[in-house]
Amino acid sequence: MIDKFKKYQAQTTKNPLGLEIIKAKGSYIFTKNKKYLDFVAGVSVNNIGHSNSKINNSIVKQLKEYSHVMVYGEFVQKPSVELCELLSALLPNKLNTTYLTNSGTEAIEAALKLAKRSTGRQKIISMKNSYHGSTHGSLSVSGFETRKRRYRPLLPNVHHINFNSVEDLNIIDNSVACVIVEPIQGGAGFIESKKEYLKKLRAKCNEMGVILIFDELQSGIGRTGKMFAFEHYNVTPDILVIGKALGGGFPIGAIICNQLLMNKFKSNPILGHIT
């Protein structure tokens, strides 16, 4: 199978691990002859283990009713409505409306578009050493030049500042559409925000009418001891981006904000964001 893998399926490194997985259960993955404790976890995805019976049973039950009918907010689908309701119940009152996507990087794209759409501004502030995804917009706001240099030109008007630098917040003015930040930087080695930093960032965004986006794709869904990392800081974003562990092993992402802000996607044009 490894020969067919190398012949027919694209790889992302010159020397892939090449483990032929035949089964996964709980915290373990299995090849024909070995059992491995899985510290990869689908890259921060399998938060409740492989082959979780509750997830599997839910999938089987849903497939007996229907699978795909419409991804946008047009048809009423009980599972997605109940998910959005649950997320609202877990979050502060201002984060009460959810747009579901197929992945985390799609959710980042949606958040950036919504910020530009709602403010009428183009400039975006992000952090050095940040990671937000690999599609065009999310790569543009990511802070690792080694990942970006082969794909330039990327989005214009993106400026990167030093993470946790209060002094650098002075670049935020009324020409900025949004600031996007990971409360805990994942790709940089799990670097935590300083509490005072996030509070001053929130205050600066309030002062300048700038949308504050928290990317909790890696830090969200219980990975820090609270459901969302921003809860440790008592600072609430305008837009929250989640994904990865939200699906427990299946592709999903979401942006969550207040309904007034989300309504910007309804008109001029209609279907203002299509995932």
Task: Locate each region found by the language model.
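Conserved N-terminal phosphate-binding loop of PLP-dependent enzymes in the Aspartate aminotransferase
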Residues: 1-275
